[in-house]
């Protein structure tokens, strides 16, 4: 039996990964992390979506220690979430939570070991992203190797969106006939606003720009998507 664990926040990317995983695996387990994030309403959104989409199980794990250690505008109300800046100098944004994906993928692997899943699926990508070092393909592969050595079992880290831009991620949701669900019922906004979000933060900017690009050129974007990932 094919089983997978999806690292699930209830945002656009992880929900798209969940939708795809449900087509590819016999059992799909979701794991969501409560680290005291500013936009913690995402946890309720994740619960609703996991139930609505039919995940096999959904575990919400308290990892509050990350909030104590990682200083970020997503973990401290005293640090404002920055608006999108097209002229940013390339420095890490204040929304970066150091160690987040290291911790999440490690714990997801332990959960995968428990439920005998062969894969951990995460929605990180290197194309349209905010410059976070723990979203890079190089990092994911290195951590995957280390965890396999540490637990003595091969658990594949799957990154379906790694080389997709945001327009192609929207196209993937549309391919599975879930574009409206992704648009209106997921929470990607750093300020915790569901759907189209605040429209000001970097996450909302990337999401809106990708949607506009997809809607303006659907046929070409879908063709690009199919060529990249081998969809029929």
From Swiss-Prot:
It comes from the Bacteria. It catalyses: 7-carboxy-7-deazaguanine + NH4(+) + ATP = 7-cyano-7-deazaguanine + ADP + phosphate + H2O + H(+). GO terms for molecular function: ATP binding; ligase activity, forming carbon-nitrogen bonds; zinc ion binding. ATP binds at residues 8-18. CDD domains: QueC-like. GO terms for biological process: queuosine biosynthetic process. Binds 1 zinc ion per subunit. Zn(2+) binds at residues 189, 198, 201, 204. Gene3D superfamilies: HUPs. NCBIfam families: 7-cyano-7-deazaguanine synthase QueC (TIGR00364), PRK11106.1 (NF008317). Catalyzes the ATP-dependent conversion of 7-carboxy-7-deazaguanine (CDG) to 7-cyano-7-deazaguanine (preQ(0)). PANTHER family: 7-CYANO-7-DEAZAGUANINE SYNTHASE. Belongs to the QueC family. This is 7-cyano-7-deazaguanine synthase. It comes from Yersinia pestis. The gene is queC.
């Amino acid at each position: 039996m094919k089983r997978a664990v999806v690292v699930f926040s209830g945002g656009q990317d992880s929900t798209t990964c969940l939708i795809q995983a449900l087509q590819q695996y016999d059992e799909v387990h979701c794991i969501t992390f409560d680290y005291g994030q500013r936009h913690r309403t995402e946890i309720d959104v994740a619960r609703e979506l996991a139930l609505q989409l039919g995940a096999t199980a959904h575990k919400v794990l308290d990892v509050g220690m990350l909030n104590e250690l990682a200083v970020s505008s997503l973990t401290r109300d005293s640090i404002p979430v920055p608006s999108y800046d097209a002229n940013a100098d390339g420095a890490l944004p204040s929304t970066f939570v150091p160690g987040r994906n290291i911790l999440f993928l490690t714990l997801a692997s332990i959960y995968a070991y428990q439920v005998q899943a062969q894969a951990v699926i995460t929605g990180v990508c290197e194309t349209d992203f905010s410059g976070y070092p723990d979203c890079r393909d190089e990092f994911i592969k290195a951590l995957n190797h280390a965890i396999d050595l540490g637990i003595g079992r091969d658990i594949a880290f799957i990154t379906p969106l790694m080389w997709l831009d945001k327009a192609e991620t929207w196209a993937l949701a549309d391919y599975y006939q879930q574009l409206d669900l992704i648009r209106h019922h997921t929470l990607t906004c750093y300020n915790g606003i569901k759907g189209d979000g605040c429209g000001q933060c970097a996450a909302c900017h990337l999401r809106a720009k990708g949607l506009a690009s997809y809607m303006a050129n659907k046929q070409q974007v879908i063709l690009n998507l199919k060529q990249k990932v081998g969809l029929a």
